[in-house]
Structures are given as structure tokens and as C-alpha cells.
Amino acid sequence: MGCGTSKVLPEPPKDVQLDLVKKVEPFSGTKSDVYKHFITEVDSVGPLKGGFPAASQGANPSPGTPRTSHTEPPSEPPRRARVAKYRAKFDPRVTAKYDIKALIGRGSFSRVVRVEHRATRQPYAIKMIETKYREGREVCESELRVLRRVRHANIIQLVEVFETQERVYMVMELATGGELFDRIIAKGSFTERDATRVLQMVLDGVRYLHALGITHRDLKPENLLYYHPGTDSKIIITDFGLASARKKGDDCLMKTTCGTPEYIAPEVLVRKPYTNSVDMWALGVIAYILLSGTMPFEDDNRTRLYRQILRGKYSYSGEPWPSVSNLAKDFIDRLLTVDPGARMTALQALRHPWVVSMAASSSMKNLHRSISQNLLKRASSRCQSTKSAQSTRSSRSTRSNKSRRVRERELRELNLRYQQQYNG
């Protein structure tokens, strides 16, 4: 979520949602699109992950910025001057309640800012979506449809919503602990026990979503954030821009082609109706990366990548796989199953012997060196510059960028070849 050209948008389900979040009615005052010049003035802040439900502290937002006078002194830091400019461009109801601190992410029709509640001084993230654009409106509707229903420790929480005729402001929790793999690289130690603890939190969140009839459809490491920098931080699932929400008892089959290539399930590639088992396939890919620092399916050529996924062919060769338990490999195998009906559900995955036994284990082999080396090696091979490749922050390159999102035309061609091969 966050970029109109990066994903195929989901179909809006026809169901009745339970609104648990405060909604502020549209502002009736005079409107002017003062935001249209905003992008060019805040150009030094990098984009925020694949979507913007939560913000990592890694975006380096500026510290609490005091109010600036109308005339900026020549020595005023550029970042502070920019903050002063875009702070005034938010709806007055938002700025009356929240102090805008820094821009921490942006997409083609959305911006995310770090804010502080004026009364409590509690930090939050506000996502502003331009709903005057069709893509922004559809993504906003999809995300709100989910976030207004969910209350779970491992899912990003929506606090309140402000609406105008052309924009929606979503106030959310602010995740400051960083991305999953950044934490692994920085930690210095990572065992199968650590992996199962991460997966337990993610699986519990996914189990909750599936019980509500919600399918995420874009689970990947960059959408899994640590809530705070502490060692006891929980993992939260973010980015529900492609999620599908069906009321209980409704038709559970989905047809929209969407997702990120390396994590997309085979049944989506061949454009068959699918269920929430696509989330479990993605979790299998995540588990594989979590234990090795490498991808089970990877190729710069999309067609070859999709063929690998359709065959379900991957291997456990290279480090650190010889040191990984057979139970862990069995866990992955039961998720990376081409037949969606044979895949484990979230509840079954939580009850898998590996998750149950390793989570209670007191000592396991440290896999950190191999995992971090593999993550950084892959990052280096995909970075545009040597400098970024050598940086620890370059581990963010393990994510799939906009140019590697699923394209409908490619899947139509792939599906045609699939039908010719297997049906004719």
C-alpha cells in the first residue's frame, strides 16, 4: 500500500463492518488544495516501507520541533523549515489535537507523519490519503474496512479517523522498533527458538484475522514491525491496503490478482479462485527467510520466478541449513505446498511440533552469522551503489520494490501458457 502503481487493488467486499474507531465527520469549512505543492518541499525523507500503517524509527524523523516564526532565519536547519511548512497544511482539526513532527513516509497518494498528541504527549503516526484519486479511495476503503474491526496485540491499531471531501487522516500506533530483519542483523544472536517466537506472534495475528474472514494478501517481512526497540518488543502486522474482508458465512473465495511476486501463492499466479491459504504460503516464505536469510524462490526474470513457484521447487542447500532441525524444515514444507488444501491453517501451524517444542527450548545453535551474511549478501547484489550495499541499513533491500510488484498482464500471459501446457 502507498503507491497507486505498485499493486493490483483488491475488490471491495459487500459486507457490514463493525466500526470500533472514532470517526470525525468531514470538515465543512472552505477547502483549498494547499497540499498540492507538498511533495517537492519534503524530498529528503525516504519512503516508508511497502505501506504506511506504522512507521519505523529507521526513517530518521527529526526530533520534536518547536514552532517556527513566519520568517525563517538563514541558519534554520532545512528539515526544521520543511516541517514548519507542511505542518500548516493539515486539516485544522488534526493540528488542534496533534503536533505534527516529521514526514516519515510517502507514496503517490498517501503521506505518513510522526505526530504527538498535544494533551498526552503520546507519539502516533498519521496516514493521510488523497481520496480524490480512485486508487487512494480504494486503498483507504480496504484498509479502514479491516482496521475498524480488529483489536489484537499483534495487529496495528487504528486510533481515530478524520475525513474531508478529498482526504482521510488515519491516526495509528507508531511502531519504533524497526523491521524484522534489521533487528535480526543487529541482534548478534538468532536461534530457532527466536524464530518460533517471532512466528508465534505473527501466526496468532493471522489466526485472528482469518477467524474474522480477513485475508491480508500481502504478508512479507517489511510488513512485520517491532513495536519498540526493547528486547521484549512484540511484532505487529501492518499494511492492510490489499486485504479482503468477508463477513462470516460469506463466500470465502477471492479472485483479485494482487501481492508481491516472491511471496505470492501458486493459485494466485494461475488466476484461480483462492482462499486465506495464500497468507499461509507467504508465511512459509517468511519462515524460510527467517531461518536462512535467503529466498526459497528468487529470479530476476519474472517468468522463471513464477515457474519456480508453480512447481513449488526449493532446496535446503547451503548455510545454515545443515544446522537447522528437520522439524523446522517440515514446518516450512507444510506451508510451501502447491495444493492450497494441503497447507496448514494458522491454528495448525501454531500447534506444529516445531513451534511448540522450540519455543520452550532453552538452548539452540546460533544461526545469526549465516543468516545475517546471507541477508547482507542478497542486499549487496540488489543495491544500486556499493555504499548502500555495505551499510547495515541496506538489509532493507531484501524487500521487493515497486518494480517487482505483481503485474496483471504478466500473469495473463503466464496463465495462458499454463493452460496450454496442462489443458491442451
Curated annotation (Swiss-Prot):
Record's keyword annotation contains Kinase: yes
Post-translational modification note: Autophosphorylated on serine residues. Myristoylated. Required for membrane association. Prerequisite for palmitoylation to occur.
Compositionally biased residues, Low complexity: 385-398
SMART domains according to UniProt: S_TKc
Which reactions appear under catalytic activity for this entry?
L-seryl-[protein] + ATP = O-phospho-L-seryl-[protein] + ADP + H(+); L-threonyl-[protein] + ATP = O-phospho-L-threonyl-[protein] + ADP + H(+)
Q: How does the UniProt record describe the way this protein sits in the membrane?
A: Lipid-anchor
| Modulation of this protein's activity | Activity depends on Ca(2+) concentration.
So what family is this one in? Belongs to the protein kinase superfamily. CAMK Ser/Thr protein kinase family.
State the name under which the record lists this protein: Serine/threonine-protein kinase H1
Organism from which the protein derives: Bos taurus
